[in-house]
A protein has these predicted regions:
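Regulatory sensory and allosteric helical modules in signal-transduction proteins
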Residues: 76-114, 121
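GAF sensory/regulatory domain recognition
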Residues: 43, 55-89
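Conserved nucleotide-binding and Mg2+-coordinating catalytic segments in signaling enzymes
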Residues: 26, 184-203
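Active-site-proximal structural segments of metal-dependent nucleotidyl cyclase/transferase enzymes
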Residues: 202-214
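Short hydrophobic/glycine-rich mini-motifs in sensory/regulatory modules
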Residues: 136-146
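Signal-transmission linkers at sensory-effector interfaces
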Residues: 1-36, 183
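Amphipathic alpha-helical "output/dimerization" segments
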Residues: 138, 150, 154-173
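A short, aliphatic-rich beta-strand micro-motif
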Residues: 129-137
């Protein structure tokens, strides 16, 4: 009977999380900019999983990683400014797993100490004892990752699945943000750029996400 009750609570937690996820996407779609959209999504992820921190990392053209978005719980120190332009060797083990379509699920950080000492040193400094990180894919290519630190043990078993579901919307938002930035740097007063502007606008319209609730 105890196991049945526990499974019932888990099922209810999952349904509640799905409903909250749909609401987060609806709220995110109403934001004025993609930056705001991404912040809303991270806030949802962090608060609903009772995590200390939620974040997005993006890979640049030199394979360096940058923490581009971050949400932190009350009392947790922000880390974004200290996590910029990180060399490839820092996340090498993670990207190897991402290339194999695997996520990073660590319930006890001490398990990482001998397996991935470089990453362990980065994480232990931030007072992290557990984390779940999933890759972000664009056309099959890993463009970065996002995840949460110290999520509630109550939700741990389905954190990865929830992050993967939300990941599709995050990638779509990142792509829309990039296209908006392209448009902003183009000069609309130069007739030579008219064709390029029209092409960029068409790409933006194609990328606008009409995500339906899950």
């Amino acid at each position: 009977c105890g196991n049945l009750n526990e499974r019932g609570h888990k099922s209810e937690d999952y349904r509640n999380m799905e409903a909250a996820l749909n609401e987060a996407i609806r709220v995110a779609q109403r934001q004025e900019s993609m930056d705001q959209t991404l912040q809303v999504l991270l806030e949802f992820v962090g608060k609903n999983l009772e995590a200390g921190r939620a974040y997005i990392f993006e890979k640049d053209d030199h394979d360096h990683d940058h923490n581009t978005y971050e949400w932190v719980a009350k009392g947790v120190l922000p880390e974004k400014d200290t996590l910029q332009d990180l060399p490839p060797e820092i996340f090498a083990e993670w990207y190897r797993k991402f290339d194999e379509n695997q996520s990073i699920v660590t319930e006890n950080l001490e398990e990482m100490k001998d397996v991935d000492p470089k990453m362990y040193e980065v994480l232990v400094r931030q007072n992290i004892h557990s984390l779940v990180v999933v890759p972000l894919y664009d056309d099959g290519k890993v463009i970065g990752f996002y995840g949460v630190d110290n999520p509630s043990t109550r939700y741990f078993e389905f954190v990865s699945e929830m992050l993967q579901i939300m990941g599709h919307f995050i990638v779509s938002s990142l792509k829309q943000r990039n296209l908006v930035r392209e448009l902003e740097v183009m000069s609309y007063s130069d007739p030579l750029t008219t064709l390029g502007n029209r092409y960029a606008m068409e790409r933006y319209i194609e990328q606008v996400d009409h995500t339906e609730p899950i």
